[in-house]
Amino acid sequence: MEPQKGIFIAESAKVIERAVRAGYEPVSFLLGERWLDQMMPLFERLAVREGAGPVPVFVASMELMEQLTGFNVTRGALAAFRRPRQIPVAEFLGGVVEAAGERPVRVCVLEGIVDHTNVGAIFRSAAALNVDGILVSPTCCDPLYRRSARVSMGTVFQVPWTRIGSEARVWPHDGLAALRDAGFSCAAMALTDDSVSLDDPALQEIDRLAIFMGTEGAGLGAKTIAGCDRAVRIPMAHGVDSLNVAAASAVAFWQLCPHVSNEYHYQPGLYH
């Protein structure tokens, strides 16, 4: 669990810029000397924000940055941001349903995923493939952790997310109840005797669908699978029975989420 109050660290110019664009409040910046010019346009925008105070910018050699942080800062830029308020699940689900309008709603529930790289990769796929929101269980790692945010390429600041479930000892019952109260059908990505194929047309007809993804190795818990309305499997060849959770999420999102235009829109300042 991440602290309810405090800060998180973003690493790399791209990730920092996406955090700022998403409305996260910076506390301070630490840059390698050669990254200062690249970051100046962002600092100039921050300087003219209405009602915002000054944000300190510290510039140091890469050697000093490594001494200060305790790791190799390969991306050359770090920023501390204030952690936002955690949105209650009912409010969160109401928001994503309202934002979706008339189209089907798709959310993903991450159960107990402890690898920050996988969490970041799942968020990146969710942003690309039109997932409406992500909910993380009490034992899932922090999406705002530095490595998660970096692997996601900053999409953790784009995809709406919140915690679901009050504590591990009552999971998944409280999480499943919250989703059903909001009108969601729950699908466990799991290989069971009665699982349906991901390409089953009936899945596309579900108006509000929560896709449950399990932890690395063990997958979803037995209580979670039993509590969901159905289990769903990805059809695979050559005797392979599972994929890495990040890869599996991308396949599931592509199949189950409404497809969007394939036009690519360049956004200055976000892509380098």
Outline where the language-model segments fall.
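Active-site/ligand-binding-proximal alpha/beta "capping" segment
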Residues: 187-240
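Short, acidic/turn-prone active-site loops that include or flank metal/cofactor-
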Residues: 34-36, 62-64, 139-141, 164-167, ...
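RNA substrate-binding interface of SAM-dependent RNA methyltransferases
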Residues: 21, 51-52, 90-194
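Structured adenosyl-cofactor binding patch, chiefly the S-adenosyl-L-methionine
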Residues: 79, 125-129, 143-157, 222-272
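Short, hinge-like loop/turn segments at secondary-structure boundaries
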Residues: 45-48, 76-77, 151-155, 204-207
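N-terminal positively charged helical leader segments and presequences
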Residues: 1-72, 268-272
